[in-house]
Amino acid sequence: MTAIDLLQPAEVFPTWPRAQRELDVFAREVPPAPHVLRTTGLLTPARAERITDWFLGADAAPDGDTRRAYRALARETAHVFAVATQCLGVRVRIAQEEPYESAAELCAELREHGTMTLVREATHPLLSPDELDRLRVVHDVFGHAALGLGFDLQSEYATWLQCRTLFSAQARPAAFCELVGAVTAYVGTGEKPGLRAKLPPAALL
Protein backbone atom coordinates (compact mmCIF):
# COMPACT_ATOMS: atom_id res chain seq x y z
CA MET A 1 0.00 0.00 0.00
CA THR A 2 1.19 3.54 -0.74
CA ALA A 3 2.47 5.21 2.41
CA ILE A 4 0.71 8.28 3.80
CA ASP A 5 3.68 10.60 4.10
CA LEU A 6 2.01 13.80 5.22
CA LEU A 7 0.70 14.46 8.70
CA GLN A 8 -1.73 17.12 7.48
CA PRO A 9 -3.71 17.94 4.32
CA ALA A 10 -1.37 18.76 1.44
CA GLU A 11 -3.70 20.93 -0.65
CA VAL A 12 -5.06 23.86 1.34
CA PHE A 13 -6.60 27.00 -0.17
CA PRO A 14 -9.18 29.65 0.79
CA THR A 15 -12.34 28.47 2.51
CA TRP A 16 -15.93 29.20 1.43
CA PRO A 17 -17.50 30.72 4.57
CA ARG A 18 -21.06 30.80 3.19
CA ALA A 19 -21.01 27.06 2.56
CA GLN A 20 -19.53 26.44 6.00
CA ARG A 21 -22.29 28.49 7.63
CA GLU A 22 -25.00 26.52 5.83
CA LEU A 23 -23.37 23.25 6.85
CA ASP A 24 -23.28 24.39 10.47
CA VAL A 25 -27.01 25.13 10.28
CA PHE A 26 -28.04 21.80 8.74
CA ALA A 27 -25.51 19.44 10.35
CA ARG A 28 -27.01 16.79 12.62
CA GLU A 29 -24.12 17.16 15.06
CA VAL A 30 -21.29 19.63 15.56
CA PRO A 31 -18.50 18.91 13.05
CA PRO A 32 -14.83 19.12 13.98
CA ALA A 33 -13.46 22.66 13.88
CA PRO A 34 -12.44 23.67 10.33
CA HIS A 35 -9.02 24.76 11.62
CA VAL A 36 -8.39 21.25 12.94
CA LEU A 37 -9.53 19.62 9.70
CA ARG A 38 -7.34 21.95 7.64
CA THR A 39 -4.17 21.49 9.71
CA THR A 40 -4.24 17.97 11.12
CA GLY A 41 -3.72 14.58 9.50
CA LEU A 42 -6.51 12.46 10.98
CA LEU A 43 -6.17 9.33 8.84
CA THR A 44 -3.41 6.99 10.01
CA PRO A 45 -1.69 4.61 7.57
CA ALA A 46 -3.03 1.63 9.51
CA ARG A 47 -6.61 2.89 9.27
CA ALA A 48 -6.22 3.65 5.57
CA GLU A 49 -5.00 0.11 5.00
CA ARG A 50 -7.98 -1.35 6.86
CA ILE A 51 -10.35 0.78 4.79
CA THR A 52 -8.70 -0.34 1.56
CA ASP A 53 -8.80 -4.01 2.56
CA TRP A 54 -12.48 -3.71 3.45
CA PHE A 55 -13.46 -1.85 0.29
CA LEU A 56 -11.62 -4.21 -2.05
CA GLY A 57 -12.65 -7.34 -0.15
CA ALA A 58 -15.18 -9.90 -1.27
CA ASP A 59 -18.20 -8.18 -2.77
CA ALA A 60 -21.65 -9.70 -2.29
CA ALA A 61 -25.02 -8.63 -3.64
CA PRO A 62 -26.44 -5.77 -1.53
CA ASP A 63 -28.56 -7.10 1.33
CA GLY A 64 -31.54 -5.47 3.00
CA ASP A 65 -29.47 -3.38 5.41
CA THR A 66 -27.33 -2.08 2.58
CA ARG A 67 -30.34 -1.18 0.47
CA ARG A 68 -31.98 0.65 3.37
CA ALA A 69 -28.78 2.57 4.07
CA TYR A 70 -28.50 3.63 0.45
CA ARG A 71 -32.16 4.66 0.30
CA ALA A 72 -31.57 6.84 3.36
CA LEU A 73 -28.43 8.26 1.77
CA ALA A 74 -30.31 9.15 -1.41
CA ARG A 75 -33.14 10.86 0.52
CA GLU A 76 -30.85 12.84 2.78
CA THR A 77 -28.51 13.80 -0.04
CA ALA A 78 -31.47 15.21 -1.99
CA HIS A 79 -32.30 17.44 0.99
CA VAL A 80 -28.73 18.72 1.38
CA PHE A 81 -28.39 19.16 -2.39
CA ALA A 82 -31.43 21.45 -2.22
CA VAL A 83 -29.62 23.49 0.42
CA ALA A 84 -26.67 23.85 -1.96
CA THR A 85 -28.79 24.89 -4.93
CA GLN A 86 -31.46 26.96 -3.18
CA CYS A 87 -29.62 28.53 -0.24
CA LEU A 88 -26.20 28.89 -1.87
CA GLY A 89 -27.43 29.14 -5.46
CA VAL A 90 -25.03 26.47 -6.75
CA ARG A 91 -25.51 25.62 -10.42
CA VAL A 92 -24.23 22.33 -11.82
CA ARG A 93 -23.26 21.44 -15.38
CA ILE A 94 -22.62 17.95 -16.80
CA ALA A 95 -19.67 17.51 -19.17
CA GLN A 96 -18.08 14.66 -21.10
CA GLU A 97 -14.49 15.46 -20.10
CA GLU A 98 -12.92 16.41 -16.77
CA PRO A 99 -12.96 20.23 -16.67
CA TYR A 100 -10.57 20.81 -13.76
CA GLU A 101 -6.84 20.36 -13.51
CA SER A 102 -6.91 20.63 -9.73
CA ALA A 103 -9.12 20.82 -6.68
CA ALA A 104 -8.11 24.46 -6.37
CA GLU A 105 -9.85 25.23 -9.69
CA LEU A 106 -13.06 23.47 -8.63
CA CYS A 107 -13.17 25.18 -5.24
CA ALA A 108 -12.36 28.60 -6.68
CA GLU A 109 -15.21 28.29 -9.20
CA LEU A 110 -17.66 27.34 -6.47
CA ARG A 111 -16.42 30.04 -4.11
CA GLU A 112 -16.34 32.84 -6.69
CA HIS A 113 -19.16 31.93 -9.08
CA GLY A 114 -21.33 29.31 -7.38
CA THR A 115 -20.94 26.92 -10.32
CA MET A 116 -19.32 23.53 -10.88
CA THR A 117 -19.06 20.90 -13.58
CA LEU A 118 -19.39 17.12 -13.19
CA VAL A 119 -18.37 14.23 -15.39
CA ARG A 120 -20.70 11.32 -14.70
CA GLU A 121 -19.28 8.12 -13.24
CA ALA A 122 -19.95 4.55 -14.32
CA THR A 123 -23.19 2.87 -13.30
CA HIS A 124 -23.60 2.45 -9.54
CA PRO A 125 -25.13 -0.72 -8.05
CA LEU A 126 -27.79 1.16 -6.03
CA LEU A 127 -27.69 4.88 -6.78
CA SER A 128 -29.14 6.38 -9.94
CA PRO A 129 -26.92 8.73 -11.98
CA ASP A 130 -28.81 11.74 -10.59
CA GLU A 131 -28.50 10.50 -7.01
CA LEU A 132 -24.78 9.94 -7.42
CA ASP A 133 -24.36 13.39 -8.98
CA ARG A 134 -26.16 15.00 -6.05
CA LEU A 135 -23.90 13.23 -3.57
CA ARG A 136 -20.80 14.43 -5.40
CA VAL A 137 -22.11 18.01 -5.38
CA VAL A 138 -22.81 17.83 -1.64
CA HIS A 139 -19.31 16.46 -1.03
CA ASP A 140 -17.62 19.11 -3.19
CA VAL A 141 -19.64 22.05 -1.87
CA PHE A 142 -19.79 21.27 1.86
CA GLY A 143 -16.52 19.36 2.01
CA HIS A 144 -13.83 20.52 -0.40
CA ALA A 145 -15.02 24.06 -1.12
CA ALA A 146 -16.28 24.91 2.37
CA LEU A 147 -13.05 23.73 3.99
CA GLY A 148 -10.74 24.78 1.16
CA LEU A 149 -9.15 21.34 0.89
CA GLY A 150 -7.94 19.32 -2.06
CA PHE A 151 -7.92 15.75 -3.29
CA ASP A 152 -4.97 14.31 -1.36
CA LEU A 153 -5.94 11.53 1.02
CA GLN A 154 -5.73 13.54 4.25
CA SER A 155 -7.89 16.24 2.66
CA GLU A 156 -10.43 13.67 1.49
CA TYR A 157 -10.66 12.20 4.97
CA ALA A 158 -11.07 15.66 6.49
CA THR A 159 -13.94 16.42 4.10
CA TRP A 160 -15.55 13.15 5.17
CA LEU A 161 -15.34 14.10 8.85
CA GLN A 162 -17.17 17.31 7.99
CA CYS A 163 -19.74 15.87 5.55
CA ARG A 164 -20.61 12.87 7.75
CA THR A 165 -22.39 15.28 10.09
CA LEU A 166 -24.98 15.92 7.37
CA PHE A 167 -26.19 12.30 7.43
CA SER A 168 -28.16 10.16 9.85
CA ALA A 169 -26.81 7.04 11.54
CA GLN A 170 -28.70 4.96 8.97
CA ALA A 171 -27.25 6.73 5.93
CA ARG A 172 -23.74 7.29 7.25
CA PRO A 173 -22.31 3.81 6.47
CA ALA A 174 -23.37 4.15 2.82
CA ALA A 175 -21.90 7.65 2.70
CA PHE A 176 -18.64 6.26 4.09
CA CYS A 177 -18.47 3.71 1.27
CA GLU A 178 -18.95 6.41 -1.34
CA LEU A 179 -16.84 9.23 0.13
CA VAL A 180 -14.05 7.32 1.89
CA GLY A 181 -13.84 3.73 0.70
CA ALA A 182 -13.32 4.31 -3.01
CA VAL A 183 -10.82 7.17 -2.77
CA THR A 184 -8.78 5.46 -0.04
CA ALA A 185 -8.55 2.29 -2.11
CA TYR A 186 -7.59 4.33 -5.18
CA VAL A 187 -4.75 6.12 -3.38
CA GLY A 188 -3.64 2.93 -1.66
CA THR A 189 -3.39 0.82 -4.80
CA GLY A 190 -2.93 3.35 -7.59
CA GLU A 191 -5.85 1.79 -9.48
CA LYS A 192 -9.33 3.27 -9.60
CA PRO A 193 -11.78 0.68 -8.25
CA GLY A 194 -15.24 0.11 -9.63
CA LEU A 195 -18.26 1.55 -7.86
CA ARG A 196 -19.57 -0.65 -5.05
CA ALA A 197 -22.41 -0.66 -2.54
CA LYS A 198 -21.36 -2.11 0.80
CA LEU A 199 -21.41 -1.12 4.45
CA PRO A 200 -18.24 -0.83 6.55
CA PRO A 201 -17.74 -2.47 9.93
CA ALA A 202 -18.66 -0.14 12.75
CA ALA A 203 -15.01 0.17 13.81
CA LEU A 204 -14.18 2.02 10.59
CA LEU A 205 -16.91 4.65 10.86
Language model features with spans:
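Amphipathic interfacial helices
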Residues: 118-152, 159-165, 181-188
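Long acidic/polar interaction regions in large eukaryotic complex-forming proteins
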Residues: 59-141
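Polybasic, proline/glycine-rich intrinsically disordered low-complexity segments
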Residues: 168-205
